[in-house]
Amino acid sequence: VNSQGLEGAMVQMISHGVVSGALFLCVGVIYDRMHTRDINFYGGLVNRMPIYATVFMIFMLGSVGLPGTSGFVGEFLVIVGAFKYSSIVVIGAASGIVLSAVYMLYLYKRIIFGVIENEKLKEISDLNLREKSILIPLAIAVIVIGIFPNIFIDPMRLPIELIISNYEIANGK
């Protein structure tokens, strides 16, 4: 147990809550319009839904842990903390990060880019005011946490140090 690992875990929990919730909302937006979750149904949404494509991209990049997003901060700190104990664990974690990046990039490419082949998609509308008022603040949060992580990390430092010291006392270190 070390401070980097615990700080990373806390930031990752916050990030995962925001990003995963936002990705589910993004799925809900297109499901609400098209009533299907089949990836093969979509393609070319950037042409009809540029705001949706932008916020979806921010959440997808946060999910894969791109630097400048909340996902990077948490993943980086967890990996730094884990590296102090086991490089094998780090290799496993890094492999999972790479696999999730491949899946998310494929998903984004398939849904957002390409040519609109489905006639129903030619009439799809971009985000309405309600959807924007929910998704845009979440996208801003993903970026703010990624650029200014100390906003969240600094208030956690003392409690994390107390957890570590209690852990060390309990384990006779």
Regions found by a protein language model. Name each.
Residues 49-51, 104-173:
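Cytoplasmic/organellar membrane-interface segments at the starts of transmembrane helices
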